[in-house]
Amino acid sequence: MIALEARAGMATLEARGLAYTRDGQQILSRVSVSVHPGERLAVTGPSGSGKTSLLTLLAGLDTPSSGEVYIDGIRLTGVAGPGQGVALVLQGYGLVSLLTAAENIEVALRAAGRAPSEAAAAAREALGQVGLGAHADHLVEELSGGQQQRTAVARALALRPRLLIADEPTAELDPASRAITLTRLFEVATGDGALVLATHDPEVAARCDRILDLRPAAGDDG
């Protein structure tokens, strides 16, 4: 069992006893954690420990073998999204290669109910925040891997989420871009916002308020 002690008050995100098995192999066993407004949670652990699987479950993109996920006290029964104040930055980024960086963000914002003019302005503002203002009109297929990663982060930021779930959101970035992007991500966890990010980087984890380490404890029978 892996658990972090719960704080008092309503959690933005709560996982209760999550277990996950894939192809007969147990990936996660009884993981419990809660994240409150203003908190930054790092999910750490060695390769294959289940970091990506956990974030996928927290986002509602897969179904746990057992256990439940709650957002603002309401049980999650589908994919989490802007309707629940949630934004995702997952591996693969989910960008449309034949649209520009700005258009990818505009599509997401308009799907979330923003007016076209507001979406266009917000897209460019978000790209500027991660240092991609000059690339707003570049097709995604013309961008480097790091630029695509920052575009995905900008899209999530533009949604103004109360909960941002990010899987290795700076893995492809050079030191300067990494610093800028982390600053913007951590700004989500101010006021009522919360951030959950998986990372293999101990420096990133150390900047978070709490760490959920998926490395099994010695003698843990799973």
List where the protein language model places each region.
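Catalytic Walker B motif of ABC-type/P-loop ATPase nucleotide-binding domains
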Residues: 164-167
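ABC ATPase C-loop
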Residues: 132, 156-157
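Conserved ABC ATPase "signature" region
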Residues: 117-135
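Conserved signature/switch motifs of ABC ATPase nucleotide-binding domains
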Residues: 138, 159, 191
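Helix-to-loop junction immediately C-terminal to a conserved catalytic motif
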Residues: 59
